[in-house]
Amino acid sequence: VIRVFGGKPNKGVSEKQAVQNIIANMKLACDYAGEKGVMLGMENHDFLIDIDRMLPIVEAIDSPWFGVNFDSGNIARTSNPYKELARIAPYSINAQIKVEIPVDGSKEHADLARIINLLKNANYRGYIVLEYEGGEDPYKAIPSYLKKLRNLI
């Protein structure tokens, strides 16, 4: 799986045109990726942290070489980020789990069990990656978070 991004619209490009550009270019990239046997996972990032914007793009790209690179820490301002993550989980081909999650614009400790359960409920069968960006000493924090994730999986 190669992680890909939709990017940000260039100045003067409408949201509608930006979405059309992403769809057209991802379809081309999927054709090439398929020739090489490579999956492309588009991450909910930048312009696509808004799941209402991301899902129509994902659904428009009908390719066996395409899916979502699920990132639990990249969600637009919402009071229920878990609900938004559950919407992209069924399309996920790779999952990056962060220990913090944005809730109404503020970072909170992520409910790792809830994230793993929503992936399980979507029949996710891919890799789960810990992407640590927390404020604690990573040499102490990462082993603890890995243990929690292993127990949940």
Language-model-detected regions and their locations in the chain:
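Histidine-acidic metal/acid-base catalytic patches
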Residues: 50-153
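Active-site acidic/histidine proton-transfer and metal-coordination neighborhood
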Residues: 1-67, 75-77
